[in-house]
UniProtKB/Swiss-Prot annotation:
Membrane-traversing stretches: none
One example GO MF annotation: structural molecule activity
Cellular component, GO annotation: host cell nucleus; T=7 icosahedral viral capsid
Assembly and interaction partners: Self-assembles into homopentamers. The capsid has an icosahedral symmetry and consists of 72 capsomers, with each capsomer being a pentamer of L1. Interacts with the minor capsid protein L2; this interaction is necessary for viral genome encapsidation. Interacts with protein E2; this interaction enhances E2-dependent replication and transcription activation.
Function field: Forms an icosahedral capsid with a T=7 symmetry and a 50 nm diameter. The capsid is composed of 72 pentamers linked to each other by disulfide bonds and associated with L2 proteins. Binds to heparan sulfate proteoglycans on cell surface of basal layer keratinocytes to provide initial virion attachment. This binding mediates a conformational change in the virus capsid that facilitates efficient infection. The virion enters the host cell via endocytosis. During virus trafficking, L1 protein dissociates from the viral DNA and the genomic DNA is released to the host nucleus.
Protein name per UniProt: Major capsid protein L1
Localization annotation: Virion; Host nucleus
Main localization of the protein described in the UniProt heading: virion
Keywords, sorted A to Z: Capsid protein, Disulfide bond, Host nucleus, Host-virus interaction, Late protein, T=7 icosahedral capsid protein, Viral attachment to host cell, Viral penetration into host cytoplasm, Virion, Virus endocytosis by host, Virus entry into host cell
Length: 515
């Protein structure tokens, strides 16, 4: 029987084949009661805070800024080949061992400090916050020497794959012929892995500044020729496998310290429609009225990180991971851990002065009768950073079931390759040919070796490699983070208490009644 419906939409039918379901690692990874502690050495880095110092094309002093990311790629030992593991703990024919991250502490050395960055030729004209007069026609060059204290950011991202960043870059227009010289190009959001040494956001946004600011005068020196990245947390937290971020901690802090405007012709001027955005200037006013040349609306703020205090520190404290945010509950596939750090709360730049006619290694040779002159000294700038990484890992087992192997093969085929599963090779189809004198000119060129080498998927990227293959220990009580873990989990032995001797009076035995 026909009936009337108020809406006529599409009819959605279920798929003909079942949709693949992403398994959580808790469904096929079995935990053990075996834990290990791992710790890196003290990791130090020194460089120039604003740019690389080059000599003949070679970098003599690298750029080391507090506004850079530090991405540590920690290499873990293969638990299936680990000598400290009891062979009776698992069956190598039906199981494989993996590491699970349960605790981490990122140590940072040095005092807190508020740094300064800027540009000696910054495109700034006038004060638009509290102006005392209206600016007249601009000169050809209005650039000033301006410095700021950058936005204060602390960021920690932990995963078994590199963190993904995002920034705004140039985009190809649909019609290149329609884009004339001097016109604003289209822009697009671009993703890339965050590498060690990449610049972060310091209050001017995440963008490709060398391409988007061709005047080289709109941002400080340390990002004027760099790409500022920001972690794409929306994308990483929605990843079906959750390998890029097990967990993250983030704290941002800033306020607008000054309000200025940029100089230069406006590419898209305010529409000249009286009564909409403004009213026309009265022509009967004196000719020297500066408002006949309307000012620039390219407003911008200079950020400030404000107060820096140790009570808001994300580092130098342990993090215990009970549940990751994704389906991967902190299983370190590939025996790797990526730790991404951004921390400019220790933004101290050392200013080093060296007298020109004195050995730099013997500065005390300056005579006490010397009369100061600034021209007698060379000034240098250096930035230093200090890190230490500590981990607590739990040993886990993965069964070599067919459905689990199929799931891992879809997720990352390199996992099965690293496990070196002994598949039965097919029977030979026939007799093969083997030549002697392979390097002879009379013999054909031999075929290349078919056995593929282990290819590093991140060989094109720059990370701070930390080798922890020989840093594991099962004696957790010998390390600070290990003792904290034992105390948190209740595995630490209780304090031995002495027995107290109490004087007691013996009671007389009661006589038994006799009938």
């Amino acid at each position: 029987m026909a009936h009337w419906s108020s809406t006529s939409g599409k009819l959605y039918l279920p798929p003909s084949t079942p949709v693949a379901r992403v398994l959580s690692t808790d469904e096929y990874v079995k935990e053990t009661d075996v834990y290990f502690h791992a710790r890196s050495e003290r990791l130090l880095i020194v460089g120039h805070p604003y740019y690389d110092i080059e000599d003949g094309g070679d970098i003599k002093v690298p750029k080391v800024s507090a506004n850079q990311y530090r991405v540590f790629r920690c290499e873990l030992p293969d638990p299936n080949k680990f000598a400290l593991i009891d062979t009776t703990l698992y069956n190598s024919d039906t199981e494989r061992l993996v590491w699970k991250l349960v605790g981490i502490e990122v140590g940072r050395g040095g005092p807190l400090g508020v740094g300064s960055t800027g540009h000696p030729l910054f495109n700034k004209v006038g004060d638009t916050e509290n102006p005392s007069f209206y600016l007249g026609p601009q000169e050809k060059d209005e650039r000033q020497n301006l410095s700021i204290d950058p936005k204060q950011t602390q960021l920690l991202i932990v995963g078994c794959k590199p963190a993904v960043g995002e920034y705004w870059d140039l985009a190809e227009p649909c019609d290149k012929n329609s884009l004339n010289n001097g016109k604003c190009p289209p822009i697009q959001l671009v993703n890339s892995y965050i590498q060690d040494g990449d610049m972060g956001d310091i209050g001017f946004g995440n963008a490709n500044f060398p391409k988007l600011q061709q005047d080289r005068a709109g941002v400080p020196l340390d990002i004027v020729d760099s790409i500022s990245l920001w972690p794409d947390l929306l994308k990483m937290t929605k990843d079906v496998y959750g390998d890029h971020v097990f967990f993250y901690a983030k704290q941002e802090q800033l306020y607008a310290r000054h309000l200025f405007t940029h100089a230069g012709p406006i590419g898209e001027p305010i529409p000249n429609v009286s009564g909409v955005y403004n009213y026309a200037v009265n022509p009967n006013q004196p000719e020297q009225n500066r408002r006949t040349n309307i000012g620039s609306y390219l407003y911008f703020t200079t950020p400030s990180g404000s107060l820096n205090t140790s009570s808001s520190q994300l580092f130098n404290r342990p993090y215990w991971i009970r549940r990751a945010q994704g389906t991967n509950n902190c299983i370190c596939w590939g025996n790797e851990v990526f730790v991404t750090v951004f921390d400019n709360t220790r933004n101290i730049n050392f200013n080093i002065s060296v007298k020109k006619d004195v050995n730099p290694l013997d500065p005390l040779n300056v005579a006490s009768s010397y009369m100061y002159s600034k021209d007698d000294f060379n000034q240098y700038s250096r930035h230093t950073e200090e890190y230490e990484l500590e981990f607590i890992f739990q040993l886990c087992k993965v069964g070599l079931d067919a459905d689990i192997l199929a799931h891992l093969n879809v997720m990352d085929p390199r996992i099965l390759e690293n496990w070196q599963l002994a598949y039965v090779p097919p029977a030979p189809s026939g007799i093969g040919d083997t030549y002697r004198y392979l390097k002879s000119d009379a013999t054909k060129c031999p075929a290349k070796d078919s056995s593929a080498e282990v290819v590093d998927p991140y060989k094109e990227y720059t990370f701070w490699n930390v080798n922890l293959t020989e840093k594991f220990s099962s004696e957790l009580d010998q390390y600070a983070l290990g003792r904290k873990f034992l105390f948190q989990t209740g595995l630490l032995k209780r304090r031995v208490r002495t027995d107290y001797t109490v004087a007691t009076v013996s009671k007389p035995n009661k006589r038994k009644r006799t009938r």
